[in-house]
Amino acid sequence: MASLAQQLAGGLRCPPLSNSNLSKPFSPKHTLKPRFSPIVSAVAVSNAQTRERQKLKQLFEDAYERCRNAPMEGVSFTIDDFHTALDKYDFNSEMGSRVKGTVFCTDANGALVDITAKSSAYLPLAEACIYRIKNVEEAGIIPGVREEFVIIGENEADDSLILSLRQIQYELAWERCRQLQAEDVVVKGKIVGANKGGVVALVEGLRGFVPFSQISSKSSAEELLEKEIPLKFVEVDEEQSRLVMSNRKAMADSQAQLGIGSVVTGTVQSLKPYGAFIDIGGINGLLHVSQISHDRVSDIATVLQPGDTLKVMILSHDRERGRVSLSTKKLEPTPGDMIRNPKLVFEKAEEMAQTFRQRIAQAEAMARADMLRFQPESGLTLSSDGILGPLTSDLPAEGLDLSVVPPAVES
């Protein structure tokens, strides 16, 4: 047996254990799971969410700083540069200034307009047209339309501008009326109202006043309402918003063109058992049933209808009463053509009228020769276009009544 010293020098060694459970590794039958308190778990989740929020916040802040300070790809300036340029943009938003814009949205109350400003502008329905309309589409205001507008206000709620087309149209209407006055032109005006001094006529979108003293007919204001009458401008004053017109001046010019024997174009206004009323440039003339054709006309409606356009000859003109007698009978190349072929009558109207005036001139020459036997100093007058003048001072200034002249061809 080795000595104790030898054992200590060689190291102590334990004898091998017997084949028992103690010689095997420890392996518990049940694994123990760690247990955490609910409070500790909740704190851990909360800390994780906080860290995630802080991380996202930092990402957003970094991205914003890059947008502010770092030039973007393809863009040579920063966001600050953009805001500076926008502030310096020369956009005139003063009241009364004009801007061009494109309509991009409409509704029952108006339209939204892109005028390349910081916000869209608004065009109210009442400012979309010089005439009364029910919706902006009636004035041609639809998405995609580009127009020039005038700034008339600002919406305090969102600082958007309020636009008008009507004011521009009014300016153009006044300019047009001044031009028509300078040219002394006869225009048509629709009677839309009346007061104790006269009637109100709508001309070029403006409301003109026509004093009763400047109305040639004896019609009342109620009878003239909604009718169109010829007018001339007497006063056009945009500053005072005064537009005064005269029906008498217009009628005088129109009547000067109504020479006896001349051919004019007219429109059938209405039919009566005794004839048809024809509008010849603002003056109503009567085409008597006996002057429609050489053939008998039993029903005028078989020959004419309201709205028909036709050529007629002036037979007589009573300026005092404002009555004009017309004829298509005198224009028939062959008796009955007005019933069978009215188109031919209108095509030959000038030719037939010229022939008719030549026959009148011959009759006048014969009458002059007869009168010279008794009144050598007197005579007939005939204008270059064949319009008859007075034979003596007792005859009407407008000349002879040609309704009694026999037809060129006997029926």
Curated annotation (Swiss-Prot):
* Protein family per UniProt: Belongs to the bacterial ribosomal protein bS1 family.
Q: Does the keyword Zinc-finger apply?
A: no
Entry's localization field: Plastid, Chloroplast
Q: How does it assemble?
A: Component of the chloroplast small ribosomal subunit (SSU). Mature 70S chloroplast ribosomes of higher plants consist of a small (30S) and a large (50S) subunit. The 30S small subunit contains 1 molecule of ribosomal RNA (16S rRNA) and 24 different proteins. The 50S large subunit contains 3 rRNA molecules (23S, 5S and 4.5S rRNA) and 33 different proteins.
- Transit peptide: first to last position: 1-41
Please name the Gene3D superfamilies in this protein's record: Nucleic acid-binding proteins
Keyword Ubl conjugation, does the record have it? Answer: no
Q: What is this protein called?
A: Small ribosomal subunit protein bS1c
Q: Which GO terms describe its molecular function?
A: mRNA binding; structural constituent of ribosome
SUPFAM superfamilies to which the protein is assigned, alphabetical? Nucleic acid-binding proteins
Q: Which organism is it from?
A: Spinacia oleracea (Spinach)
Query: What are the alphabetically sorted keywords of the record?
Result: Chloroplast, Plastid, Repeat, Ribonucleoprotein, Ribosomal protein, RNA-binding, Transit peptide
Gene Ontology cellular component terms for the protein in this record: chloroplast stroma; ribonucleoprotein complex; ribosome
Q: Which residues form the S1 motif domain?
A: 96-166, 184-248, 261-329
Gene encoding the protein:
RPS1
Give the top-rank taxon of the lineage listed in the UniProt record for this protein. Eukaryota
Described by its record, this protein's role is as follows: Component of the chloroplast ribosome (chloro-ribosome), a dedicated translation machinery responsible for the synthesis of chloroplast genome-encoded proteins, including proteins of the transcription and translation machinery and components of the photosynthetic apparatus. Actively engaged in the initiation complex formation via a strong mRNA-binding activity. Possesses a poly(A)-binding activity which might play a role as a control element in chloroplast mRNA translation.
Q: Tell me, what's a Pfam family for it?
A: S1
Main location per the UniProt record: plastid
